[in-house]
Design a protein with these regions (language model features):
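A conserved mid-protein helix/loop that constitutes part of the nucleotide-sugar donor-binding site
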Residues: 14-22, 209, 213-232, 365
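Glycosyltransferase donor-sugar binding loop
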Residues: 35-44, 183, 214, 218, ...
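A short helix/loop element that forms part of the nucleotide-sugar donor recognition site in Leloir-type
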Residues: 52-54, 189-204, 348-349
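Nucleotide-activated donor-binding/catalytic signature segment of Leloir-type glycosyltransferases, i.e.
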Residues: 65-66, 253-270
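Short His-centered aromatic/hydrophobic patch
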Residues: 105-111, 128
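Carbohydrate-associated surface elements
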Residues: 161, 182
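Short hydrophobic beta-strand element within catalytic cores of glycosyltransferases
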Residues: 305-309
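Conserved acidic donor-binding segment of nucleotide-sugar-dependent glycosyltransferases
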Residues: 321-331, 339-344
Length: 388
């Protein structure tokens, strides 16, 4: 199996896909490699090098070979930096494809490369992680082209909202398979020791209410809405604290510098999100579009942080019975945060019975079954030769 990544940078889709690869390799029945189009990307006001990325390190640490075409360019949502590829890039890609039985494309952006003429023809499984295909620039057209050419044999949707959105965009329904996101339940769990240690590291009292916002600094996340709600909530909650983490959530971001106080903590990208969530009372999401199955809601909820989210993607069904869905209104969000803090014990009481639904094990088993089926059904159909 060969996975194509647009690049290694902070984001839930890369975390999920990398975790799936780790699980499939652990199973021992499949061999996986990764080809990354970019070795460094510039987005969310940060330069993110492949070799510094936690997903890259986890994959290589597990023995998964990762190569790159070496591109370095700014990226915007849904847009590959260029759809023109050099001769050496195509040659490197051809060598990588030649050794694979099945190609996994992390989102539709890498299809701009896979649609190039003369590359080895292999069955492609496209892993979709958004609910707004129309906002993916030329990537949606690249997906349509690959499907029309007969190379795409399945699309994995991480949420029902993803399936519905792509079906509405004209993607054949029989290609769309829903495999909901899952997380490592041994890692993401309530942890009183980690809770106290995290709070102590930031000077937050043990009894103070804490809201965490785990997101990259991007328009779809509606950071301004979160900040308006945070200012009002902090004014009402004199002991409250707000934690913001993710790519671009640092004082180096001029748009956030003025927000910093002794009760607003900008942490940037963290590798210990289980501790961040365990140390929080509420995990907030204020996104306006694009979300499918937000990883922050699942991870936070599994650590006993009450999810409070706008109604985007599958968020409402994910938090049903365990959190609060709000309109995109600061006053409503503030009220919901306070209610979540006050009634936290109520919202977390039924979580033990719901944990299996969000299991990484369940997710990986579903991917393995689909890939086994694809391999069996297409082994000879799309491999007429290296120049297909």
């Amino acid at each position: 199996m060969l996975s194509l990544y647009e690049g290694f940078f902070s984001g839930g889709a890369r975390i999920v896909h990398s975790d799936v690869l780790l699980g499939l390799v652990e199973g021992g029945r499949q061999r996986h490699r990764v080809l990354s189009l970019h070795s460094e990307v510039h987005r969310e006001t940060t330069a993110q090098h492949m070799r510094d990325d936690p997903c890259y390190r986890s994959l290589t640490g597990a023995g998964i070979d990762i190569t790159s075409l070496g591109r370095t360019a700014p990226l915007t949502d849904g847009t590959l930096a260029a759809s023109a590829f050099t001769g050496p890039e195509l040659a490197d890609t051809a060598r990588a494809l030649a050794g694979a039985d099945v190609i996994l494309s992390l989102k539709e952006q890498p299809l701009a490369l896979l649609n190039q003429a003369g590359l080895p023809r292999r069955p492609i499984v496209v892993c979709l992680h958004r609910s707004d295909p129309e906002n993916q620039g030329p990537a949606l057209d690249a997906l349509r082209t690959a499907i029309a050419d007969g190379k795409v044999v399945a699309c994995v949707c991480c949420a029902d909202s993803t399936r519905d959105a792509y079906a509405a965009a004209g993607i054949p329904a029989d290609l769309l398979h829903v495999i909901p996101n899952g997380v490592d339940l041994l890692r993401f769990r309530p942890d009183p020791v980690a809770r106290l240690a995290f709070r102590r590291s930031l000077g937050i009292p043990a009894t103070a209410p804490v809201v965490v916002f785990a997101a990259r600094y991007a328009p779809m996340k509606n950071v301004p809405l979160f900040l308006r709600a945070a200012r009002t909530w902090l004014a009402r909650e004199p002991t409250g604290h707000v934690v913001m983490c993710g790519a671009g959530m640092t004082e180096a971001n001029g748009a956030l510098r003025a927000e910093v106080t002794d009760r607003v903590h900008l942490l940037g990208v963290r590798r210990d999100m289980e501790a961040v969530y365990a140390g929080s009372d509420v995990v907030a999401l204020t996104s306006s579009s694009g979300e499918a199955a937000p990883l922050c809601l699942i991870e936070g909820m599994m650590c006993d942080a009450v999810p409070v989210t706008t109604d985007v993607g599958d968020s409402a069904s994910i938090v049903a019975g365990h959190g609060i869905v709000t309109p995109a209104d600061p006053a409503a969000i503030v009220t919901a945060w306070s209610a979540a803090v006050t009634h936290r014990a109520h919202y977390t009481a039924t979580l033990p019975r719901a944990r299996e639904r969000f299991s990484r094990t369940r997710m990986i088993a579903s991917y393995a079954a689909l890939l086994d089926t694809v391999t069996t059904e297409t082994r000879d159909e799309l491999r007429p030769g290296l120049s297909g």
